[in-house]
Amino acid sequence: MFMINVLLLIIPILLAVAFLTLVERKILGYMQLRKGPNIVGPYGLLQPIADALKLFIKEPLQPLTSSTSMFIIAPILALTLALTMWIPLPMPYPLINMNLGILFMLAMSSLAVYSILWSGWASNSKYALIGALRAVAQTISYEVTLAIILLSVLLMSGSFTLSTLIITQEYLWLIFPSWPLAMMWFISTLAETNRAPFDLTEGESELVSGFNVEYAAGPFALFFLAEYANIIMMNIFTTTLFLGAFHSPYLPELYSINFTMKTLLLTCSFLWIRASYPRFRYDQLMHLLWKNFLPLTLALCMWHVSLPIMLSSIPPQT
């Protein structure tokens, strides 16, 4: 039964990822005053299926000088970790109800760095290695602020369980009392998922395609799936943290619809940002984090710690 539940989680994720690529191309197309894909199937609806078929029936080429085992393991690890992060997400019921669900997700997103690093190193290409090193530095840096923002939210929620956040936000979304944290969280998730304007790992002008430059066919598709699964997962996480939907045990469908609509809006805003903003310079990216976000998040975290002590003389609850 558990394996059936796992499959019922994985298959919709992969379908959502497939059609997110189509939505992205359509949105970018309309924002640039063109149609986007509209030939394969009605309104281009079969385009993701055609793309998947094309990628998976091609021969997966590999550089002669590459480290074979790591070169193959890296994309598999990337997709496995991307799918594993969905386990504790309450939609409205998680696959496994974890006590430390939030810490589990943070740990898994940290491990995703290894797949990027290994892929860049195993390719034995200087472009891939530079892209991988950039990705690692960027991901590790932005995880610092993500962790501090999470801690601040947990101090308001009082638990490390994601399901508790639904109860916390029954009367008021956490985006209202903590909107500076929500803004910084959203920008940090953009950087964490290597999306524009922070897609310096794939800087076409200087790095061709970044850490996956030597990958083709199936392994490239696995990286692609992992990236888009992470985007949807991060937006679901944002919705759970700051835009909690009302949950009635008698009508869980209403929660799921509400939840999905909010996640879809956030995902579309990711694509809107990609169409609107140019890429950051690397030093500006690091400056934004270490000089702006980190002091602000630390100050707000201290505020959340001291508030219950000042007002009610009780220690912060987690």
Swiss-Prot record:
UniProt-listed InterPro entries: NADH_UbQ_OxRdtase_su1/FPO, NADH_UbQ_OxRdtase_su1_CS
GO cellular component: mitochondrial inner membrane
Organism lineage: Eukaryota, Metazoa, Chordata, Craniata, Vertebrata
Biological process terms in GO annotation: mitochondrial electron transport, NADH to ubiquinone; mitochondrial respiratory chain complex I assembly
Membrane topology label: Multi-pass membrane protein
Quaternary data: Core subunit of respiratory chain NADH dehydrogenase (Complex I) which is composed of 45 different subunits.
Keyword tags: Electron transport, Membrane, Mitochondrion, Mitochondrion inner membrane, NAD, Respiratory chain, Translocase, Transmembrane, Transmembrane helix, Transport, Ubiquinone
Function of the protein: Core subunit of the mitochondrial membrane respiratory chain NADH dehydrogenase (Complex I) which catalyzes electron transfer from NADH through the respiratory chain, using ubiquinone as an electron acceptor. Essential for the catalytic activity and assembly of complex I.
Family named by the database record: Belongs to the complex I subunit 1 family.
Catalytic activity: a ubiquinone + NADH + 5 H(+)(in) = a ubiquinol + NAD(+) + 4 H(+)(out)
UniProt source species: Equus asinus
EC number: 7.1.1.2
Pfam families: NADHdh
Major place of residence: mitochondrion
The protein, known as: NADH-ubiquinone oxidoreductase chain 1
Transmembrane annotation, as ranges: 2-22, 70-90, 100-120, 147-167, 171-191, 217-237, 254-276, 294-314
Family matches, as PROSITE patterns: COMPLEX1_ND1_1 (PS00667), COMPLEX1_ND1_2 (PS00668)
GO terms of molecular function: NADH dehydrogenase (ubiquinone) activity
UniProt KW Nucleus keyword: no
